[in-house]
């Protein structure tokens, strides 16, 4: 499964937050950048039953910079 995180700001910090990390059972690997869009391959046990978008949004909002950041997360 792939997800897209779109944000005009803080792309490097978002990439560092997820790349090679596992958050709430979801493992992220950076797969590319297209403009303001960061693409990640996501894997995990029982991934089809996890709300990957909500987990990703929650992780960004939990950062110091994420509270005021405009971004979107979608499944590709």
Regions found by a protein language model. Name each.
Residues 3-4, 38:
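Contiguous segments within soluble domain cores/interaction surfaces
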Residues 27-60:
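Short, intrinsically disordered low-complexity segments
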